[in-house]
Amino acid sequence: MDHDLLPLRGRPKKLDRNLILHSALMEYWSKGPSNVSINDICKLTGASKPGIYREFKSDDGLKKSALKIYKTLAVQPLLNILYSDQPIYKTIDDTISFITQDRKTSGIPNGCLLVMMAALSEQLGCSTLKELNKIRADIYAAFFHCVERSKLENGFLGMETDVAAYFLENQHIGAMRMQKEGISNETIAKVLSFSFKMVFQKNSNQYN
């Protein structure tokens, strides 16, 4: 018997972790995390269900890992803008441009995975929920920093910093919901510009 033709035994073929994470992320992002199962990921990638469980331990583990990738791809660039030391009006312009970028050109879905997960927080596992809350706290902290910096430039309306930070964070959330609903980026940009005028008074003439 030709031993080269014998079926392989021992440890299973190594799972492509990056493929699994990318596929899971895009499915969660485009369809919603509650509408995608591990079976769906298996069919999409050709991976075995036991293999995915060995790698990620659970559906919760897979979602948490995908969420970390999402932060790197879609959240960290926003944080970098908000923490930049450029003039505040430029920070606002860049923030609006980032939020309303053409997703088709970048090959990513419309909307925000964080917003979708937050709406389903009661259905999330403990580790995914913990990661979600951490990322949301990071976004709030970045807006808080941006507001504090604007005060140093005398470009702030006078609202309490924490209130303004929550307001701006929720403008971001609202913009993502509008985008998911198919509202044009041009319209969303106008809404955001109007909202930012309410907070950053000094820069209101930048958006006329």
Question: Where do the protein language model's features map onto the residues?
Answer:
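N-terminal intrinsically disordered/low-complexity leader segments
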Residues: 1-15, 203-208
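Alpha-helical structural segments
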Residues: 15-26, 30, 44, 61-84, ...
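Amphipathic C-terminal alpha-helical segment
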Residues: 102-105, 149, 168-186, 198-207
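Short coil/turn segments at alpha/beta junctions that flank glycine-rich nucleotide-binding fingerprints
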Residues: 31-34, 110, 153
